[in-house]
């Protein structure tokens, strides 16, 4: 029996573990799924993970759960059965099991808090018997034709590896300076109801991570909040049917040119704020936007001075701005895991990529199964698969399709997922 190791025990890991468990119950041979996690299942949706205080609302519909969109194409003539079995671990099934389904309906099907979403994921993980090895991965190495995940206490060997999560939220431009908060430090203060009181506050970043922090900052005693991002303005994420369908059904995504895909991602996913956050921004005259990239930060005379670089035509302009408090919400490094690779593993990866490791090279090399092409043993990177495979895979928008793609590559060519399933539809 082969083994699939997953770095992180979040929503993607739970979705893959659930699908593997159901397939195993159906008599289909699938790899053993082992998640290696430093804190706990769904930790990034709790205050302990550093990315939230747990009290804010989920930005994605909770019905987009671990099985969504319930359109499996893994087991010929049994895909409807697979979908039906997966509904046992749906959001609705969790609410029924916890005697809260009727209340959720009567309240208008509200988005759950991050904490409640983490409880749902933990419920699924418990019910499918998900294997979790607790420990922080210190190195990702290759031994023969297998991966080796080294923690301080143990080593997990696997035939394939999937890396998930945004990394750690502790990074900061000025570590140790009390006027410069990392994402984790900000949410720790919010979770402990430690009110921020400052005249001029800056938030670095124009994506959903920064948007969530702005949503929290509204409640604190600050005179002005400046959002710093390289975009021309604070764009609103497209949230209509046509935009959402790109996330749920990526069938037509490969037919788009790279330029068209990048344009779609820019409008719907990267560096954009949700419409609900934008509505709050409109109502608060403390919010301002400053265009530029932060190139330098220094603490001077009780302030943080940020140097911003802005391209204006052919000219690169640098300006300096002072703030009483700065929150680095620029988001996670897409290559946060790169320092974990052993030299041999890095050489193997760069050989497959045909050049030095970079985010752009990796994104363009992700195949249909969400793994890096021409690299053995397999390395699944769903968080970098948006450009080539569709915008829903890096987030929560199509966890059921994600598990199909990953597990489908382990079932052999006869069971490899079809581009679209025409013969079966499983109603919910």
UniProtKB/Swiss-Prot annotation:
It catalyses: L-lysine + NADPH + O2 = N(6)-hydroxy-L-lysine + NADP(+) + H2O. It holds the Pfam family Lys_Orn_oxgnase. Its EC number is 1.14.13.59. Coiled coil: none annotated. Its cofactor is FAD. Pathway: Siderophore biosynthesis; mycobactin biosynthesis. The keyword NADP applies. Keywords: FAD, Flavoprotein, Monooxygenase, NADP, Oxidoreductase, Signal. Residues 1-20 form the signal peptide. One of its GO terms (biological process) is intracellular iron ion homeostasis. InterPro entries: FAD/NAD-bd_sf (IPR036188), Lys/Orn_oxygenase (IPR025700). GO terms for molecular function: L-lysine 6-monooxygenase (NADPH) activity. Belongs to the lysine N(6)-hydroxylase/L-ornithine N(5)-oxygenase family. Flavoprotein monooxygenase required for N-hydroxylation of the two acylated lysine residues during mycobactin assembly, thus producing the hydroxamate groups necessary for iron sequestration. Is also able, but less efficiently, to hydroxylate L-lysine (non acylated) in vitro. This is L-lysine N6-monooxygenase MbtG. It comes from Mycolicibacterium paratuberculosis (strain ATCC BAA-968 / K-10) (Mycobacterium paratuberculosis).
């Amino acid at each position: 029996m082969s083994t699939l190791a997953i770095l992180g025990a979040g929503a993607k890991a739970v979705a893959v573990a659930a699908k593997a468990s159901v397939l195993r119950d159906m008599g289909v041979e699938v790899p053993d799924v082992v998640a290696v996690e430093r804190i706990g299942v769904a930790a990034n949706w709790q205050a302990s993970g550093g990315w939230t205080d747990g009290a804010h609302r989920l930005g994605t519909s909770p019905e987009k759960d671990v099985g969504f969109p319930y359109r499996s194409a893994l087991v010929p003539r049994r895909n409807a059965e697979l979908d039906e079995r997966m509904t046992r671990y749906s959001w609705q099934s969790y609410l029924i099991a916890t005697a809260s389904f009727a209340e959720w309906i009567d309240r208008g099907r509200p988005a759950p808090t991050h904490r409640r979403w983490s409880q749902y994921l933990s419920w699924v993980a418990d019910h499918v018997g998900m294997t979790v090895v607790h420990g922080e991965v210190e190195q990702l190495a290759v031994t023969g034709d297998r991966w080796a995940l080294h923690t301080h206490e143990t080593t997990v060997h696997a035939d394939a590896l999937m890396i998930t999560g945004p990394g750690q939220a502790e990074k900061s431009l000025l570590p140790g300076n009390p006027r410069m908060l990392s994402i984790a430090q900000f949410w720790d203060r919010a979770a402990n109801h430690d009110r921020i009181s400052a005249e001029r506050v800056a938030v670095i970043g124009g994506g959903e991570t920064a948007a969530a922090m702005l949503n929290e900052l509204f409640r604190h005693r600050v005179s002005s909040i400046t959002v710093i991002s390289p975009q021309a303005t604070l764009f609103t994420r497209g949230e209509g049917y046509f935009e959402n369908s790109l996330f749920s059904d990526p069938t037509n995504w490969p037919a788009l040119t790279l330029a068209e895909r990048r344009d779609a991602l820019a409008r719907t996913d990267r560096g954009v704020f949700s419409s609900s956050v934008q509505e709050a921004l409109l109502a608060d005259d403390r919010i301002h936007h400053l265009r530029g990239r932060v190139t330098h930060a220094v603490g001077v005379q009780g302030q943080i001075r940020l140097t911003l670089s802005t391209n204006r035509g052919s000219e690169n302009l640098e300006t300096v701005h002072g703030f009483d408090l700065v929150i680095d919400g620029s988001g996670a490094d897409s290559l946060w895991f790169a320092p974990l690779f052993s030299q041999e593993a890095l050489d193997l990866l760069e050989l497959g990529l045909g050049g030095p490791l970079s985010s752009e090279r990796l994104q363009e090399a992700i195949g249909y199964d969400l793994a890096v092409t021409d690299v053995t043993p397999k390395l699944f990177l769903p968080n970098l698969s948006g450009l080539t495979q569709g915008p829903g895979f890096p987030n929560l928008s199509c966890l059921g399709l994600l598990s199909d793609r990953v597990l489908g590559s382990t079932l052999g060519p006869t069971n490899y997922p079809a581009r679209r399933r025409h013969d079966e539809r499983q109603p919910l």
